[in-house]
Regions:
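Glycine/aspartate-rich loop-and-adjacent alpha/beta segment that forms the canonical ThDP
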Residues: 3-6, 10, 14-16, 152, ...
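Phosphate/pyrophosphate-binding active-site segments
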Residues: 16-30, 306, 315-413, 533-549, ...
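N-terminal cofactor/phosphate-binding cores enriched in small/glycine residues
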Residues: 29-119, 419
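Active-site diphosphate/adenylate-binding microenvironment
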Residues: 36-39, 57-63, 366-454
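Glycine-rich, anion-gripping cofactor-binding loops and their flanking helix/strand elements
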Residues: 91, 95, 106-107, 113, ...
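Thiamine diphosphate
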Residues: 120, 131, 138-151, 415-592
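Glycine-rich, acidic loop regions that bind phosphate or pyrophosphate groups
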Residues: 121, 132-177, 268-375, 476, ...
């Protein structure tokens, strides 16, 4: 994309995987530190307020320039040894603040470690700026130490990539990168960008120079507050239809407002930030089969907000040939390619209203009564368990969430989706890495969210997810400690696979040991000892009463609440829940 009112740029030093290019200004002989200062000034003028730095020599000019800006109170610097953790920390900062966050690495494998965070940022439309330091052109391809092909390293995962030669000004490339990261170009959603900055020696300032006297930076809490929107009631002349509103990840409060205005049942995933209000239905994924083809009141239409990612019943609903569906898409999104989904994309709420119609009182009441009966049946089954279970832990964490809540992938977010009672009003801002739904980087993401939003933050995750990013617990001496509670559901392995087809294979006996080893991945890690090693507080609970007491404590600094559970009976527990809910819902529908 050429900038408006400008001639087509010279793109010889740049790549275009994200459909946006801009040249580096020719300024031969510009010193490394001078170029770095220009890059930092443009980044900060463009709204970057947080930069995560991983140490390295080739990136030293940027590190020194950032140190100067930090001393002047212009930017918050965080230092992380592990680049993968640094990338996800920056991702969390961008999520919590809604502004671009940057991560700086040296050359070589350091850059490659950012790939998981970049991929997540791409599919989740998060403005993540990769600042990768590189060798100058004359050292590339010569076998020079820590030198590889870094330009275009992230390929189609980034909106924009620029290779900025040593000795040239990075100004225009950085400006274009900021525009691409924040979604300023038409038809491009926000997302990650790569600015590959080549530096030539000398890489350090003169020893005689010193940092300016430090200025305390004014800090403001910029995290999102849970919102409630209001829309005008649906016009009376709209036809009555058996429509449901499905709020997927990142749907936002507009989904709740639309369902309320149109008198329609709301089926909301936890990370939709729409799982509240009078129209929200409880364990909705267990209800869908009762409103299918051949039922007394089959669903006719689906209005989709956000991205549905969590359950097969929802995927089956959207795939039904007897249902018409529409997707509210006012701006470009990153999670699907145009024309690749069956929903009708609609850009404005007026067209969506015409499509959805309005729900009759009987239609909404049926869903609410069925949801209430299902929630009661589920709670009854879960309460019969003497020890803590995934659903009981998820329900407690959901009810006690304040400030910010991050839900880990795998079973954590699905347990909340199943057992989390919709609230009358939103209590916390909910986050989840649903771009690619990986388990990596969850602790680091939570740390970034907590430090960016400056609010108490809770993260719910399983033990495998926790161990995958245990290095995210490492904070250097003097680094800011977030107010972060980490709730670890520890069942000594990967429980989610027992709820998939693999659980049936395991029960068959012949492949039992293989399933446990390959998918269950059992371990005997002492999480308390791990917490001690990283200087993080730890408590161990095994009952819902113990967890409720732990969740009632204020969040000050970092703490781990480990909840021991047994995954061997998880498949049977979910079967009992499904049977109890099915019977309860059938009873409600029979009376309608």
């Amino acid at each position: 994309v050429t900038l408006p009112n400008e001639p087509a740029p010279d793109t010889s030093a740049e790549t275009d995987p994200g459909n946006a290019t801009a040249p580096a200004d020719a300024a031969p002989g510009l010193g490394a530190l001078a170029a770095a200062r220009i890059a930092v000034d443009v980044l900060l003028d463009g709204g970057v307020r947080h930069v995560v730095v991983s140490p390295g020599s080739r990136s030293a000019p940027m590190a020194y320039a950032l140190a100067e800006a930090s001393a002047a109170g212009r930017v918050e610097l965080l230092v992380r040894i592990d680049e993968r953790s640094a990338g996800f920390t920056a991702l969390g900062l961008a999520l919590a603040t809604g502004t671009p966050a940057a991560v700086l690495t040296t050359s070589g494998t350091a850059v490659g470690n950012l790939m998981p965070a970049v991929m997540e940022a791409n599919h989740a439309a998060v403005p993540l700026i990769v600042l990768s330091a590189d060798r100058p052109e004359e050292l590339r391809g010569t076998g020079a130490n820590q030198t590889t092909v870094q330009p275009d390293l992230f390929g189609e995962q980034v909106r924009f990539a620029a290779d900025i030669p040593a000795g040239t000004s990075p100004q225009r490339a950085v400006e274009t990168g900021l525009s691409a990261a924040t979604g300023a170009f038409p038809d491009l959603p926000p997302g990650p960008v790569q600015l590959n900055l080549a530096f030539r020696d000398p890489l350090v300032p003169s020893p005689r120079d010193g940092l300016p006297e430090a200025v305390e930076r004014q800090r403001y809490r910029v995290g999102f507050e849970p919102l409630v929107m209001n829309l005008p009631p649906a016009p009376e002349d709209l036809p009555e239809r058996r429509t449901v509103v499905l709020a997927g990840h990142d749907a936002g409060p507009v989904a709740e407002a639309f369902a309320r205005a149109h008198n329609l049942p709301l089926l909301a995933e936890p990370s939709s930030n729409a799982r509240f209000g009078p129209n929200a239905v409880g364990p909705y994924r267990l209800l869908l089969e009762h409103f299918g083809p051949g039922s007394i009141q089959p669903i006719e239409r689906v209005v989709l907000f956000g991205r549905p990612t969590l359950s097969r019943p929802v995927a089956s609903l959207l795939a039904r040939a007897d249902i018409e569906s529409a997707l509210y898409q006012p701006v470009p999104v990153a999670w699907y390619e145009p024309g690749r989904r069956t929903e009708l994309p609609l850009e404005n709420l007026a067209d969506l209203a015409d499509f959805a119609g309005r729900g009759s009182s009987a239609w909404l009441d049926t869903w609410l009564l069925a949801g209430s009966a299902a929630q009661h049946a589920l709670d009854q089954v879960v309460s019969e368990e003497s020890a803590a279970t995934g659903p009981s832990v998820a329900s407690l964490v959901w009810r006690n969430a304040r400030g910010q809540l991050l839900l880990g992938s795998s079973n954590g977010i699905r347990d909340v989706d199943l057992a989390g009672l919709p609230a009358p009003d939103p209590a916390a801002t909910v986050y989840a890495n649903r771009g690619l739904a990986g388990i990596d980087g969850t602790i680091s993401t939570a740390t970034g969210i907590a430090l960016g939003g400056l609010q108490e933050t809770t993260v719910l995750l399983g033990d495998v997810t926790f161990l995958h990013d245990a290095g995210g617990l490492l904070l250097g001496a003097g680094e800011e400690q977030p107010d972060l509670r980490i709730v670890v559901l520890n069942d000594s392995g990967g429980a989610i696979f027992s709820l998939l087809e693999h659980g049936g294979v395991e029960e068959g006996g012949r492949y039992g040991d293989a399933v446990e080893r390959l998918f269950g991945t059992p371990h005997s890690v002492d999480i308390a000892a791990l917490a001690t090693a990283y200087g993080v507080g730890h408590s161990l609970v095994s009952t819902t009463a113990g967890l409720a007491e732990a969740l009632g404590q204020p969040v000050q600094g970092r703490s781990i609440v480990e909840v021991r559970t047994d995954r061997r009976q998880l498949r049977q527990l979910h079967a009992r829940i499904k049977d109890a809910v099915s019977a309860a819902v059938a009873g409600v529908l029979a009376g309608r």
